[in-house]
Regions:
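Residues forming the Rossmann-fold NAD(P)(H) cofactor-binding site
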Residues: 96, 100, 104
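Acetyl-CoA-dependent GNAT
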Residues: 2-85, 90-91, 103-105, 109, ...
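Conserved GNAT acetyl-CoA-binding A-motif
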Residues: 103, 110-122
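Short glycine-rich hinge loops at helix-strand junctions in the catalytic core
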Residues: 97, 114, 137
Length: 170
């Protein structure tokens, strides 16, 4: 049976989304101590500087992701950046390209806003996530944004092409 997925902006307080985020929180809590979980709550996800997206597979919520625009800081030499947050694809929906498509959607949103740097923090033991980010061109970097370098987190960066040609190719 052919299945299709659609990615679109979504309200983070939608009941299906809050249930998925609660599932993600439980998963992260099973892997890391509370001080190593850097979770944006629903209030923060609804902020104007956050773009939140949901992926639906045959109408069912399959995943979500957000990007938060940040002003520059010392860790980025004053450059504005977008931080990938709350990225998740349900385990039974993986292997269909949903995660990669969500990531491309976030990158496209940053390009629309003329932001050429995407950063993220993920857990070192989340091997599927690390593989996804590295396959998408993200490279290891030092901690940023006040995150502690605690040995549990991995930090990644990707330069985004802001030229008209780069935007069309994305």
């Amino acid at each position: 049976m052919l299945t299709t997925f659609v990615i679109a902006p979504e309200r983070p307080d939608h009941p299906e989304v809050t249930a998925l985020l609660a599932e993600l929180d439980r998963y992260l809590a099973s892997l890391y101590p509370p001080e190593a979980n850097h979770i944006l709550d629903l209030h923060a996800l609804a902020a104007p500087e956050v773009s939140f997206y949901a992926a639906r597979l045959d109408g069912r919520l399959a995943g979500c992701a957000a990007v938060r625009r940040q002003s520059g800081e010392a860790a980025t030499q004053g450059e504005a950046y977008g931080e990938v947050k709350r990225m998740m694809v349900r385990p039974d929906c993986r292997g269909r390209g949903i995660g990669a498509s969500l990531l491309r959607t976030l990158e496209r949103r940053l390009r629309e806003q003329r932001i050429g740097l995407a950063l993220l923090e993920t857990g070192r033991t989340q091997h599927e996530a690390v593989r996804l980010y590295e396959a998408a061109g993200y490279r290891p970097r030092e901690a940023f944004g006040g995150y502690p370098d605690n040995g549990l987190s991995a930090f990644y960066a990707k330069r985004l092409d802001l030229s008209a040609q780069g935007e069309a190719a994305a």
